[in-house]
């Protein structure tokens, strides 16, 4: 290949490999042509929002004029192209800006793009979407002040404007509040993983909602404006492990109330009920015992368990290490839910041997 393309060969190989990686992450943005014509850098692809998440955000911005002030390679603009009245983009990096222009042209989209620093706004009445850099040299930044730009200066600069800021899912909600943010925090999950926490300024927030969980796999959303009258009782027939977006958004009680479930412990995210709500994955309780490895091994052996999905909350147990120690030799796939119940001197660890619903 080097004989044919010379010094360009490494760049061609890298572009080909990046396009293959991008197909699963961004393919939905361009269903007709795919991403086979797009340009990337490795870091830009890592930072790019997955297509389903970008499209979800675009639906919330339908009918608006939107300015993606950190447009990078054009992912959000591609998602907005059929929903926003107008979408414009800017970025401080001229290379990524050129890539965005190329990528959007591959979709037949003539985008309004310019080079600009996000801290120096170039639009007035548009909704501004901002994705501060959370990686540097492949390493993640976890503190809000370490974002580039930092979240505090961003919120100060756009105070009073309609703004959407993408953040890491593990952000400290209280710290965000101390920065003066008064809108909605939306936690988004996709394919079973929590992808991001998105800040929606007050003018864009749902009515009365400060926290929202959006589960893209099922299309379900729940907010803190819903009832949270979820009781605490011993396990019923089923145990439900709520989606990570629900847990991260602090909406376990609201989720339980919606689905007619209760908590096993007020500080633990597991829910339970005597019937499994439609479309939810659950674990049918077969046996319940005080956690003891030897006793657990005996119970699993008696149930012919050969593979165990192990879920743990509230106690320092490594599921993979425990699975190896159990030495299961049966033929039946089961699940073990291990959790702390109670607090202080009254707390105890309970194991539930279950049959997964799917």
Swiss-Prot record:
<dbReference type="Pfam" id="PF18096">
    <property type="entry name" value="Thump_like"/>
</dbReference>
<comment type="similarity">
    <text>Belongs to the methyltransferase superfamily.</text>
</comment>
<dbReference type="GO" id="GO:0032259">
    <property type="term" value="P:methylation"/>
</dbReference>
<dbReference type="InterPro" id="IPR029063">
    <property type="entry name" value="SAM-dependent_MTases_sf"/>
</dbReference>
<protein>
    <recommendedName>
        <fullName>Uncharacterized S-adenosylmethionine-dependent methyltransferase MT3122</fullName>
        <ecNumber>2.1.1.-</ecNumber>
    </recommendedName>
</protein>
<dbReference type="InterPro" id="IPR041497">
    <property type="entry name" value="Thump-like"/>
</dbReference>
<keyword id="KW-0489">Methyltransferase</keyword>
<dbReference type="GO" id="GO:0008168">
    <property type="term" value="F:methyltransferase activity"/>
</dbReference>
<keyword id="KW-0949">S-adenosyl-L-methionine</keyword>
<keyword id="KW-0808">Transferase</keyword>
């Amino acid at each position: 290949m080097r004989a044919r393309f010379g010094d360009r060969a490494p760049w061609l190989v890298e572009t080909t490999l990046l396009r293959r990686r991008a197909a699963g992450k961004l393919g939905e943005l361009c269903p007709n042509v795919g991403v086979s014509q797009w340009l990337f850098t490795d870091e830009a692809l890592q930072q790019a929002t997955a297509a389903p998440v970008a499209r979800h955000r675009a639906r919330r911005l339908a009918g608006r004029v939107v300015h993606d002030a950190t447009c990078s390679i054009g992912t959000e603009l591609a998602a907005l192209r059929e929903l926003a009245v107008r979408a414009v983009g800017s970025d401080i990096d001229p290379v990524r800006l050129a890539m965005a222009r190329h990528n959007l042209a591959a979709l037949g989209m003539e985008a309004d793009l310019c080079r600009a620093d996000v801290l120096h706004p170039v639009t007035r009445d548009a909704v501004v979407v901002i994705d501060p850099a959370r990686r540097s040299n492949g390493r993640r930044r976890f503190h809000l002040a370490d974002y580039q730009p930092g979240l505090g200066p961003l919120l100060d600069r756009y105070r009073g404007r309609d703004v959407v800021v993408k953040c890491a899912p593990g952000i400290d909600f209280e710290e965000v509040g101390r920065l003066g943010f008064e809108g909605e925090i939306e936690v988004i999950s996709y394919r079973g993983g929590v992808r991001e926490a998105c800040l929606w300024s007050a003018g864009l927030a749902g009515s009365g909602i400060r926290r929202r969980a959006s589960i893209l796999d099922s299309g379900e959303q729940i907010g803190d404006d819903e009832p949270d009258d979820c009781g605490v009782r011993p396990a019923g027939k089923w145990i439900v492990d709520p989606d990570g977006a629900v847990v991260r958004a602090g909406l376990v009680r609201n989720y339980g109330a919606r689905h007619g479930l209760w908590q096993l412990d007020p500080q633990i995210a597991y829910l339970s009920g005597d019937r499994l709500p439609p479309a939810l994955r659950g674990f049918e309780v077969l046996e319940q015992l005080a956690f003891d490895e030897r006793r657990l091994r005996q119970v699993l052996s008696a149930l012919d368990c050969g593979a165990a999905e192990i879920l743990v909350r509230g106690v320092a147990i490594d599921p993979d290490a425990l699975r190896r120690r159990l030495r299961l030799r049966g033929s039946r796939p089961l699940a073990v839910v291990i959790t702390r119940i109670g607090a202080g001197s009254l707390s105890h660890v309970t194991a539930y041997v279950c049959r997964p619903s799917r």
